[in-house]
């Protein structure tokens, strides 16, 4: 992986586009440093899912749902990246700690109600039991969004 100091103009541009809200470049993206076009493709997919202007969910909630999916998948690397972003976007240490522990304990109902809880439950079902997803699950999620 190439550092910022070793980057040529094309890579510097790709790295700048890949920076998190707190200014770092996650290793999952930096690994593309030898092929900046693959980094750009990775970022295009990521941003279209989580940080697109047409998304109606707040960014903190998108990152929190991503964190919960990371927990459900037992993926610590993904959790560290998504949770760092969620925590930054929540901007309330006490609230973010409470949310984090409720998700780690797989009890989102301890922090969420209504739409937010429905989305957490949908994400859990889609992650752990995708074959159990019914049309009503998808329709319900669309109503809330």
Regions found by a protein language model. Name each.
Residues 25-34, 59-74:
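Alpha-helical scaffold segments that form or flank carboxylate-/histidine-based iron centers
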Residues 1-56, 94:
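Mobile cap/lid helix-loop segments that border enzyme active or cofactor-binding sites
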Residues 102-112:
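Acidic/His metal-coordination segments adjacent to aromatic residues that form catalytic metal sites
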Residues 95-101, 139:
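Ferredoxin-type iron-sulfur electron-transfer modules in oxidoreductases and energy-metabolism complexes
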Residues 143-145:
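Conserved small/polar residues in nucleotide/adenosyl-binding loops
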Residues 65-89, 100, 133:
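Short, thiol/selenol-centered motifs that function as redox-active sites or metal-ligating centers
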Residues 66-69, 114-133:
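Amphipathic, charged-and-aliphatic alpha-helical interface segments
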């Amino acid at each position: 992986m190439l550092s910022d100091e070793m980057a040529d103009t094309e890579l510097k541009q790709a790295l700048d586009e890949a920076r998190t809200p707190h200014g770092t470049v996650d290793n999952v993206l930096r690994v593309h440093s030898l092929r900046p076009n693959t980094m750009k493709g990775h970022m295009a997919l990521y941003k279209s899912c989580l940080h697109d202007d047409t998304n109606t969910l707040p960014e903190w909630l998108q990152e929190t749902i991503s964190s919960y999916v990371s927990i459900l998948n037992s993926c610590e690397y993904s959790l560290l990246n998504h949770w760092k972003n969620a925590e930054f976007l929540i901007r309330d240490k006490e609230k973010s700690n409470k949310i984090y522990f409720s998700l780690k304990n797989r009890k989102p109902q301890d922090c969420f109600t209504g739409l937010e809880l429905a989305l957490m439950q949908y994400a859990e079902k889609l992650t752990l039991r995708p074959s159990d997803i019914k049309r009503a699950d998808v329709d319900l999620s669309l109503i809330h969004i």
